[in-house]
Amino acid sequence: MKKIAILIYPEFSIQEIGDIMYLFRWHYDIKTEIIASNSDIVVSEEGVCIKPHKTVNEFVKEDYYCLILP
């Protein structure tokens, strides 16, 4: 099943990705995966720590409907 990829970066807004993840998961039944430049934990501007599912190098575009850049 294809998913939606969301690219995160240091000091991203957790609200931006949270709303997108909620929308796709509960309104369209599409799961999301978090992508980052490396596998290190990324800290949002609110101080929330997120461990990405995959790195940019592991991203395979055929596995996803799209890549969202918040």
Region annotations inferred by a language model:
Residues M1-P70:
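Extended, subdomain-level signal for the structured scaffold at the beginning of enzyme domains
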